[in-house]
Structures are given as structure tokens and as C-alpha cells.
Amino acid sequence: MAKDIKFNLDARDLLKKGVDELADAVKVTLGPKGRNVIIDKKFGAPQITKDGVTVAKEIELSDHFQNMGAQLVKEVASKTNDNAGDGTTTATVLAQSIINVGMKNVAAGANPMDLKRGIDKAVAKVVESLKKQSRAVGDDFGKIENVAKISANGDETIGSLIAEAMKKVKKEGVITIEESKGIETYVDVVEGMQFDRGYISSYFVTNTDKMEADLENPYILIHDKKISVLKDILPILEKTIQTGRPMLIIAEDIESEALATLVVNRLRGSLKVCAVKAPGFGDRRKEMLEDIAVLTGGVVISEEKGLKLEGVTIDMLGTAEKVTISKDNTVIVNGAGEKSAISARVSQIKTQIEKTTSDYDSEKLQERLAKLAGGVAVLYVGAPSEVEMKEKKDRVDDALSATRAAIEEGTVPGGGVAYVRAISILEGFKGINEDETTGIEIVKRAIEEPLRQIVENAGKEGAVIAQRVKEEKDDFGYNARTGIYEDLYVAGVIDPTKVARVALENAASIAGMLLTTECVITEVKEENPAPAMPPMGGGGMM
């Protein structure tokens, strides 16, 4: 395959065009008055979004060289989204500014490597300033609501719903986003431990209106293998019948003979019982069964521990205040496990989360932690049309990520003001040579850009408002939503520190790589020859 090679100014100019194409499409979404972008889809209705990373991911340019520039800035948005969950548009705006001003300086003869060193030094200083400006969120649900609202483009409903969900499940809890079946957006909190396995037979149902089995104060038998024959569980069933309490059996599976006997006993009313399959698979199943055992104060009956079903005693069974089993889910409320044992299990899972390198494992461990320590809140997103619902779901997702980032590293004044306040830390800061100092100046100019862009998207003059904000101090800034200058912290216009930090670090990293590029290589497009004409038929005339 032949290659096309470009050098120096030619290469950088084409890369810059690609950067501008992508950044110009993304930056219109920034701020409370940012606009929507409509993305054509091969199947179904077009997608409407205000999510920067969603726009960036859709862009592929026909020119190979320009496309490389676009893909590099797409990487800025994607990495920022992966690390902080929000701030993708801000990162794109910062990258575009650093690249544009940087390339002008390279064209004027500045050394690209020195520029990059200056940029890196300035970014480290700005990050230091952001950390100084940062204020912890703690349990201030007002701040959590404000962060979520800003990230959801000023949607107060989303802000209050996320704050409500956080309040209910605490920091250790898990909040998931689902599509609502109606047009309402609401939060549903599952108290206690829920796992996605329902009753094995509908004959176990006690509430026929809801098709659920409700067990009050039941004993819970936890077994990690199949229960095939009745004689294995007969001793413990007889002991449970004597107590008069219901029983929940959690096992890998319950086969026909044992299941038929349980159903008959249930229908006769001699034993209120329900059987469900164990959640998870493989090693994860063992861990989840141990979690249930710790939560309910029971023991996992496992041959690995030398325990057999026929030898089970009442004190090996777990208990809970209530268990509700539907066709697909089981919820255990107020398990009788000891607080100290649950705390120890929670600490163990937290340690595993810190050590794991897999995103999937981390997510699953986080879910287990939530089920033990906090709870699970489901945020159901509804809208009149599917197109609007998907757009809203994108904003809810951003808001949730921003909220988690705020809890992690605190908050700074929003509206681009935190970056503007960081300019003072760069005043008088010099590099070891003129080009390094130019790199510092490039960052100094770039960190004004998010504020300017927010203002431009609100239909005002960016340069004028940026100058006014620079003249003031602390949290004073321009609220683009209301169109007035005010204390942004008091007005609730705040951003997560982590989002501001990660956006700048990623933007500077990719911009630095682009500025130090001297040669670009791409494949030559092959001209596909037109297919040969099919032979003409004689039409029967010879």
C-alpha cells in the first residue's frame, strides 16, 4: 500500500484544519445556552445531543490528514469522559486554543519542544491553583444538586433527582440510569440487597395481585450447589416447620424431585417457602453468596467448608426482616448480620476495588459494595419521544458523572471562572528560555477560552465579559443562564475540580503531541476502477 507523506507547515496546517472541524462542531454545546447537534443515523431517527463526547465520536473526515487531527482531539474528549465523566467540551475548547496559538508560534520559528515544556509547566501551576480553589462537598446535598444541575445544562429537575438519589444511597451506593416506560423522570430506591434472580416456580407466589412472594422474618438457607433430592433438605425443613417461620432457599438450582416437594408443601400450607437460584456465575457467585450470608447472619453451606445439607442446623441459617421475590428479582430487607461482620466485608471489597485493574471487575465490586453498604437507586429517565429521551439520558449520565467527580475532589467556581482565577498564578512565571515562556503564555490565553465560549454561546461578546471577570476576584463571574455578574458559588454555578483538572491535563497532553509533530504519514486513497460493462445481449437477433 503506497503512503502519502507531508512535512512541516503542510502537515501541521492539515492537522489544524481537522482539529478546527471537530472542535467547532463540539464547542457549540458548551454552557447553559449551548446549542444542540443533530447526528444522522443509518437506522432510526436522527440523534439530538448536547453531549460533547457523543458529537466528537461521530466525526470522521474524508481527508486522511485532516481526519488525523480530528481523531487526536476526539481522543481528548474520550479520555476526559473516561477519567472524569464530564468536561469533554471544555477539554476540546482548551485543546483547540493551545493548538491554534501554538502552531502560529511554531510557524514563526519557535522551538516546538520548548513550547511543549512551557505548556506542561504552566498546566502544572494551573492544576495547583485549581486544587487551592477547591472546596470539599462532604454531605452538602445543595452543592451536589448544583453540580448536577450545571452539568445537565441547567436542568433543575435532573439536579434535584440526583441529589435525592445520593441522599438515599449515600456515597457507597450505586445509582444506575434506566429508560422510563412513561414520560416521567423519577428515582426509585431499592432498600436492602437486591439480586437479579426470581422464584423458580410461580407456585411460590403469595401475593397474586403483584405476582410476588412475600416472606416475613424468614430463615434463609444458602447453598452453593444444586439440590437434587429431597432427603438432603428434609432435616432442615422439618426443623423450620417446627418454628412456624417461612423459609427462603438460595441454591445453584433445585431439581424436579426436591422442587415438587417444596411446591406441594407450599400449596398445602404446611411450610411457607420460596426457592431462588443463586445470583452470578463462577467465582463471582461464591462471593455474592458470601455477601448474602454476611448480610443475613447465615453460613454458605458448601462442601469446600466441609458442610453438608443433611447436617444443617437452624443457627446456620440467615434471617431478615422481610424478603420480597418477584419473577426476576429478590430483595432482602434488614438482614440480621452483625454490623462488625458487614463492616469487615465492606472493607475487604473496598481493598479489592483499589487493587483491581479491570473496569468491569471494578464496576461489579462497586455494585456488591453498594448492596452491602448503601443501596441501589435507579434513575428512570422519561420523555414524550424516544429522541428527546436519549438526549435527556445523555445529560443525566453527564450530571451523575460530574456529581461523583465533585464528591471525589471537591468543587470550584463554574462558568470558566476557576481557570480565569488561575491566571494570577502564571503572572511573572517564566521558563528557562523565551520559547518556554511563550508556552506558558499560550496556556495563559487558552484557559480564558472556556469562559469566552460559554459567553459567545449565550449570544454576548466573549472578550468584553472575560476582561470584566478578570478584573474582579474570587468567585465573582458571569452567570450565562441569567445574564448577570454575581458570586457564582452563591448562585450555585459550580464545577467539579476533577473535571476542570482532567480537561486541562488531557487537552495540553494531546496539543503538545500535535505541536511537536513534524511529519504525517497516511495511506494513499486507491482509485477503484469503474466495473466493466456487462456484455450486451443479442436480443434473439443473430
From Swiss-Prot:
Protein EC: 5.6.1.7
GO cellular component: cytoplasm
Enzyme class, first EC level, given as a word: isomerase
Entry keyword set: ATP-binding, Chaperone, Cytoplasm, Isomerase, Nucleotide-binding
Subcellular location: Cytoplasm
Positions with a binding annotation for ATP: T29, L30, G31, P32, K50, D86, G87, T88, T89, T90, G415, D495
One Gene Ontology term from the biological process aspect of the record: protein refolding
Family: Belongs to the chaperonin (HSP60) family.
PANTHER family associated with the record: 60 KDA HEAT SHOCK PROTEIN, MITOCHONDRIAL
NCBIfam families: GroEL, PRK00013.1, PRK12849.1, PRK12850.1, PRK12851.1
Function text: Together with its co-chaperonin GroES, plays an essential role in assisting protein folding. The GroEL-GroES system forms a nano-cage that allows encapsulation of the non-native substrate proteins and provides a physical environment optimized to promote and accelerate protein folding.
Protein's name according to its UniProt entry: Chaperonin GroEL
